Amino acid sequence: MSEIFWINKLNIKPRKTLGQNFLIDTNISRKITKLVQGQLADPIIEIGPGTGSLTNELLKDNYRIKAVEVDKQLTHLLRERFGDVPNIEIINEDAMSFDYSQLTGPWWIMVGNLPYNIGTRLLIKLITEVPQIHRYVIMLQDEVAERIVAKPNTKHYGSISVLFSLFTDSKLQFNVSNNCFEPKPKILSTVLTIQRETLVDEEIRFKAFEISKIAFQQKRKKIKT
């Protein structure tokens, strides 16, 4: 059944306050799933599964999924759609306040079409606080993706670029047309992969990141004055 079927069945209305734009193109969901490249022993945490387009493709590959969805109506839809599937846990909770310490056991992979309104804040939180997530396959606003992979002396380079260069190997994978969503977003989307590196000097790197934030803040103040 198509994503439009599920949207219409429960009369789902995207909420702008949650930055909701539902992925309806199963070809894109499949391309994202192929980038996961995990072992079946690697459990997946999916943030913002929405109507379950990406969730459905991940389940076809027999991944074990913990899906975190803040919207109660969408949580109901997901439970109706996947309630009989044994290897998925659907959690109605805000990804920003979710207790990630429960991600125990083997390394985790995070997959998701991140809501535009929390994408940057959530990624910074996860990279700095949740080392057990070792790989990310995510879609987010193209400008944020460009900032993550930006190199020094380029337009998008900033403190977030420093953070991800210190702790990860991040790569842009492909852009996603606005036509792949319902409703169509006004901003462009990009899929990227982030591999968190295992580091022995994380404390030093955190200090370097904090110094970079101060430096960029001072730079912005000078530009304003």
Regions found by a protein language model. Give the residues of each.
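Catalytic cores of RNA-modifying enzymes
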Residues: 1-214
